[in-house]
Amino acid sequence: METRTEDGGLTRRPTLASSWDVAGGALTHSLLLTRAGLGPGDFDWEELLAPPAPGQDLVILKRNHNNKDENPCFLYLRCGPDGGEEIASIGILSSARNMEVYLGEEYCGTSRGKNVCTVLDDSEHEKIILYKKNLKLESSTHACKIKLLSFGERQCVFISKVVVHMRSVFANSSTSSPALGSRIDLDKVQTIMESMGSKLSPGAQQLMDMVRCQQRNCIPIGEQLQSVLGNSGYKHMIGLQSSSTLGTLNKSSSTPFPFRTGLTSGNVTENLQTYIDKSTQLPGGENSTKLDECKVMPQNHSFLENDLKNAMASFLPKKVSDNSNIPNSELLPFLQNLCSQVNHLHVGNKTECQENITKHGERILGVGMEEQSICSYLEKILSKNMELMEKKLMDYIDQRIHELQEHIDDKIALLLDLLQNPNSPPTGIPLRHYDSGERLSNGER
């Protein structure tokens, strides 16, 4: 049975439905909406999920007895896709102790209820304990389902309030897709790996650190992959300044993978300065003409140096400065890549620049296609590894539960045998040695 709210403050009213039959009351009366302009900290859940007023009727959801399957009770919340609002957080006051929230089939989170009050239900003539629980969604959504959980096989659930916090959605936010990797919870992956007793290889750990840095700084991971896989450093930094300009691939496609080359902390500053000097000067004193023809190299030394610092600050989780004591392990991947590009950076003559300009369109297309294929391949690998780790973890849990069940069954069987035959020792227990203290005729005991 589907119902709608009657709150006039919102132009697009969300719908609320239940997988169980509504035996008493209406879900419309239990749904309370908060205005979209409020933030999660601007309202008090204690007040919104306060005990109901005396005499207030509760909504009763009953299990369908015609359905033999033991389906749990689900609540379905849905907003119109063109309503301009999304669900940001949910709170429920009901007899169900806990609730789980799902976005489609994807688990979102669990909220454990707190005892609020005890009310007397006139229809059932029993005391009902109401629990309050609330959950803030990591990302707002147009639709979600709520699983109500209770101890024991409850045949009905009493609902007092369903509080939904709505958030305004801008027109451009619906068309923008989330950054690659933002949907992957790396902390969860790390926890699963540690629980299985596994450790990440150095390469996998570097990849995870790079994705975590991208999630934290909201940097398109394609730019990081282009930098790591051999894009020229100065064109990568120009791409940071103008999103419409893409760097071309370095001619030296056989450049060693940056993580395999050696780098010491003593020559970091020297390599950076060398890179800046080479990037701002062309041989033969033809700086102005070749810069105009190629339209690639920046004309200002300080401008390029600032771009270099900004690129490093955006790539690393910590701010890069001249006096910062950042561990070498954090600077190593980016600086190795930068220095390897400096060693293979050769500025050609005028004909080479003209050739670069002629093939500029083809290389831009190649960069875009390669970035797309690399990002797609990386996402598939991460998703496959997460599914594999989750399957191994579930198999391990099932095995442990099975062993525990067998152990409990053995103990119960032993206890029942002992109760049925109290005088006979149970099977598997060695007999105790009793000494009567009597001596034999030969004096031995």
Curated annotation (Swiss-Prot):
Composition skew (Basic and acidic residues), residue ranges: 432-445
GO MF annotation terms: ATP hydrolysis activity; identical protein binding
Subcellular location as annotated: Cytoplasm; Mitochondrion
Swiss-Prot/TrEMBL catalytic activity: ATP + H2O = ADP + phosphate + H(+)
Region (Disordered): 426-445
EC number per UniProt: 3.6.1.-
Primary enzyme class: hydrolase
Major subcellular site: cytoplasm
A Pfam family hit: PAAT-like
Annotated Gene Ontology cellular component terms: cytoplasm; mitochondrion
Residues the record lists as Phosphoserine modifications: S177, S182, S254, S302
Keyword field: Cytoplasm, Hydrolase, Mitochondrion, Phosphoprotein
Job description of the protein: ATPase that regulates mitochondrial ABC transporters ABCB7, ABCB8/MITOSUR and ABCB10. Regulates mitochondrial ferric concentration and heme biosynthesis and plays a role in the maintenance of mitochondrial homeostasis and cell survival.
Assembly notes: Homodimer. Interacts with ABCB7, ABCB8/MITOSUR and ABCB10.
Protein name: ATPase PAAT
Species: Homo sapiens
